[in-house]
């Protein structure tokens, strides 16, 4: 049967944030995601129990789309209850291949975000590039990279 559903398909990552508009300055304006949908979450939202959110808090949700990946990222804003700082060591990250790594780094710095020193990237298949870790205003880690060199071909016998 040609229409069999695959056993798994990645739908989206979600980060919890304290100020959706501030977060969009980074995710939309610097990284280039588009806001596809935004809404206040209902009081019986599944997000409350699965994220262990105080039921008295108000939630707002934004779905973000990349150029060729619809609804691949979400931001959930929690208002009305204080959030503890993000735990260290960091337990999650999103990893993004970006076309303009220097522009993203400059934009993150303009927003006052923590930007880790750039490192040389070496992939498992021998490609090389650049990578930089950026921590958003809520302590969520975003690792950006760009490939600058291709793997060298193995000599043929």
Residue ranges and their predicted role:
Residues 1-6, 10-19, 38, 59-109, 130-135, ...:
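Vicinal oxygen chelate
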């Amino acid at each position: 049967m040609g229409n069999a559903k695959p056993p798994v398909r990645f739908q989206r990552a979600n980060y919890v944030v304290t100020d959706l508009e501030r977060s969009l300055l980074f995710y939309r304006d610097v990284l280039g995601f588009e806001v596809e949908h935004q809404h206040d979450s209902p009081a019986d939202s599944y997000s409350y129990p699965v994220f262990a959110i105080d039921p008295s808090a108000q939630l707002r949700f934004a779905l973000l789309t990349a150029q060729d990946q619809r609804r691949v990222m979400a931001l959930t804003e929690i208002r009305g209850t204080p959030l503890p700082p993000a735990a260290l060591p960091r337990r999650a990250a999103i990893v993004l291949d970006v076309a303009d790594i220097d522009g993203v780094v400059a934009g993150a710095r303009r927003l006052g975000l923590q930007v880790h020193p750039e490192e040389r990237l070496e992939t498992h298949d021998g490609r090389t590039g650049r990578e930089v870790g950026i921590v958003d205003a809520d302590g969520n880690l975003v690792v950006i990279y760009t490939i600058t060199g291709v793997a060298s071909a193995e000599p043929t016998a």
